[in-house]
Each structure stands twice: as C-alpha cells, then as structure tokens.
C-alpha cells in the first residue's frame, strides 16, 4: 500500500501564522487597555466601589500598525477622568517616528514605490501614495521655514550658481531656474544660505535673490564666487558694494574651450592653467598677456579675445590669503551640491511648477547640509584674520 503524500501550501501556512500572531497581539493590547482603564478608575467594569474615580462610557476604535500587521484597539471611553493610556502615547511617538522616517527617505532620494515596499517590509503594511503626499506637504512647511530662516553671523565668502530643471506647463516643457547660495562663515564652516526661483539668470533675478538674502541678515560678504551670468556682476555691486567678484576659473576655461579646436585643446589648457599658477596677481596678468599673444600666433583669435576680455575677473582671489586660493577661485563646492540635486531630480523628471522644483531642491540642500558636509570645517579663517590685522595696523600707521 502506497503512502499518501501530503503537500503543504507554504504561503497559506505563513498567512495563517501571521494572522494568528496578529490576533494574539490585538487581544493582548486590548487586554492591556482594559487593565489600564481599571487602574485609572480604581474599579473593574460594572463594579461598584467607593474608591471609583470615573465611569466607563463605551469604546472607540483606533487602528495601530505593528510589525505583526494592522490591529484594532478598542480604547475605553471614561467619564470624570482623562484616559491617557501609555499604549496610545507610544502609538503617537511611533506615528511621529514613522512620519519622520518616511520624510527622510523621500528627501534622501528614495522613490515613492520604494518607500511603499520598505514600509511593508518594516511594519507589515504599505503606506499609500496619498499618505506620502500628505507627509511631503508637512515636509514642505518645515523646508519653507528652513529656507526663510534668519541668517546670523558674517559670511566672508559666498558661492552662487543656478540650477536648471524642467517643468511641464500645459504640455510644453520649459526651464525652471533655481538660484542657490552657499556661504563660508567666519568660523570656516559652510552653510546653505538659501535658494530661490529665478525666471532666468539675469540681473533682475540675481538682484532680487541677493536682496532677499540680505533682508534675511546676510552681511560681511567680501567675495562672491560664481560663473559669469548675465547681470550678476552688476547685481553684486548694487546689493553688496563692499564685496568683490570672483569668476569661477573652471567655467572661464570652458568658455574659452567653446572656440578652441579639439586638436589644440591640450595646449590651450596648459596655457590657461599657467596663468593661475602664478604667485602674484601682477605676474598672472603678465602671463595672461603672453597667452593672448600666443593664441593669436596660433590663429585662435576668438580664444585670444575671450582670454583678454575675461581674465581680470578670474584674478580677484589674489587679494585674499594664498591658503584660500584653491577654494575661492572656483565654484566646485556648489558644483558638487548641484550633482546631488540633479541625482534626486532625475528620479522625478519634470515638475508641474517652479514651486515644486524649488521645494525638492531645498529638500535636498537641507538634507546634504545635515550630513558631514555641514559639520566639517571647510577652511581655516586664521589667515584672513591675520591679513585683516596686518591691514588694520598699516592703516593705523598711515593715519599716524
């Protein structure tokens, strides 16, 4: 006689076990709620007692997500006494923690679909896209408060740049420009100063952006570092008249390369770098003149003109401590931030409007600012302080 083979459906068994555990958790939690209510009223349900502190008035149901699944709590209603159960308090703390976790996952670049999968794995139930959307609205309020926070202290070095994103408006795609500023404070630490939507990178947009930063408390600006955008130099002079402007040398090189034949790119690169390898501003100017002459001899008239017209704006950094030169003559710090922004925005694709684009950019900036990026000293400012003391001493001698 052949033996009967019993086949087991593993998924069904797992489901039955999960439901058994979930039911046990639900029953245990509700028993704890009843016990808490008895303790508060100092009497069991329907019990007559002189020590009774309150009376029961039915229940209300409340859902709770646990690692075993969704359970329903039958919370006792009490009259004559406030029922603040420890279980509900833990639920509130957990609810807040879950919200914070979901927001952080979103800000860290995790897609909505991935957030749903993660919540199901962690808590036994999926968080719906509408819930994530509501949490993002909550995050937006926090991000706006951060974006508009008052700026305290002084920021000698300010780096600015524009980030272009796409928005879909009525079926047509157009650029959205987000202007970003990062400052180095007097203690040498970096801080994201702000971001604002600009219709385009022109004088009006930059002027509005700088005035907004100044209105929030930005002061002590001595050098503004950025690419040569339309109207930026004029806007810097009007809003921060005491500040100097440093054109990013990397962007300057790229601009020269646009009119340089591929076969001569390497030679031109070495020539440009030789200008900024000089130890003094005067030596750099002399080297630049020699480079312009050499480019003309190479029949690169357009490249020669770009160098001749733009070189002076790239030499401003020589007026500051030599220890800072490598970090204040380029916009590389902001370029790295922009890569982080684009990494997140690529997941989203296009935006319905400029406000949503600004929110996501600020969310990413805020996230990065809370990492090692914002807590690690970017540069020592002792050399700048020393330069100021020496200049102040020289001024005093001149007055004497």
Question: What are these language model-derived features?
Answer:
Residues 113-124:
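DNA-recognition alpha helix
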């Amino acid at each position: 006689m052949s033996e009967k083979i019993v086949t087991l459906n593993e998924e069904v068994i797992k489901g039955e076990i999960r439901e058994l555990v979930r039911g046990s958790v639900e029953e245990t939690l509700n028993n704890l709620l009843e016990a808490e209510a008895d303790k508060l009223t100092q009497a069991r349900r329907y019990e007559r007692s002189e020590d009774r502190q309150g009376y029961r008035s039915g229940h209300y149901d409340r859902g709770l997500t646990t690692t075993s699944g969704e359970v329903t709590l039958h919370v006792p209603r009490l009259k004559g006494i406030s029922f603040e159960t420890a279980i509900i308090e833990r639920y509130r703390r957990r609810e807040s923690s879950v919200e914070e976790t979901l927001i952080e996952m979103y800000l860290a670049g995790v897609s909505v679909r991935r957030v749903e999968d993660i919540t199901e794995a962690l808590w036994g139930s999926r968080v719906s896209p509408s819930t994530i959307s509501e949490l993002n609205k909550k995050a937006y309020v926090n991000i706006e408060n951060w974006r508009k926070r008052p700026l305290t202290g002084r920021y000698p070095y300010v780096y600015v740049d524009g980030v272009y994103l796409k928005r879909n408006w009525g079926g047509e795609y157009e650029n959205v420009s987000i202007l970003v500023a990062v400052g180095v404070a007097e203690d040498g630490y970096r801080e994201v100063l702000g971001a604002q939507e600009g219709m385009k990178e022109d004088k009006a947009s930059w002027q509005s952006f700088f005035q907004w930063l100044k209105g929030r408390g930005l002061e002590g600006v001595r050098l503004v570092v950025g690419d040569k955008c339309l109207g930026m130099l004029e806007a810097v002079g009007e809003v921060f008249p005491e500040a100097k402007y440093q054109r990013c040398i990397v962007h300057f090189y790229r601009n020269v390369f646009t009119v340089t034949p591929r076969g001569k790119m390497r030679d031109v690169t070495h020539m440009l770098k030789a200008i900024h390898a000089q130890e003094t501003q005067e030596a750099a100017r002399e080297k630049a003149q020699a480079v312009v002459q050499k480019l003309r001899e190479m029949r690169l008239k357009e490249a020669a003109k770009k160098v001749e017209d733009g070189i002076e704006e790239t030499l401003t950094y020589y007026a500051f401590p030599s220890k800072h030169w490598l970090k204040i003559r380029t916009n590389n710090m902001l370029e790295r931030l922009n890569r982080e922004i684009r990494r997140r925005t690529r997941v989203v694709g296009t935006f319905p409007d400029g406000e949503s684009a600004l929110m996501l950019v600020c969310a990413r900036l805020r996230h990065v600012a809370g990492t090692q990026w914002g807590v690690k000293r970017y540069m020592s400012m002792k050399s700048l302080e020393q330069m100021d003391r020496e200049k102040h001493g020289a001024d005093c001698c001149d007055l004497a």
